[in-house]
């Protein structure tokens, strides 16, 4: 059965609130490193330079700095 527009809107708002709460929590991180998806970084993340985080998996790489985040 298809979702109603009201339940779809509520779901989208919940996703946005979750995303921005994680972004806000990460921006308040006292390390000075921009971690937009702070609680999603694995424990093997490496600090590769001044304020730059890189994490590689077999399929993609997440590179983040204070200016931008790229998923390659």
UniProtKB/Swiss-Prot annotation:
Domain of life assignment: Viruses
Protein name, as recorded: Putative ORF1 protein
Annotated gene: ORF1
């Amino acid at each position: 059965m298809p979702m109603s527009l009201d339940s779809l809107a509520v779901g989208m708002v919940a996703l946005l609130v979750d995303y921005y709460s994680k972004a806000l929590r990460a921006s308040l991180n006292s390390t000075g490193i921009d971690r937009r998806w702070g609680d999603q970084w694995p424990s093997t993340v490496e600090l590769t330079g001044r304020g730059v985080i890189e994490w590689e998996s077999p399929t993609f790489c997440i590179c983040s700095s204070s200016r931008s985040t790229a998923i390659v």
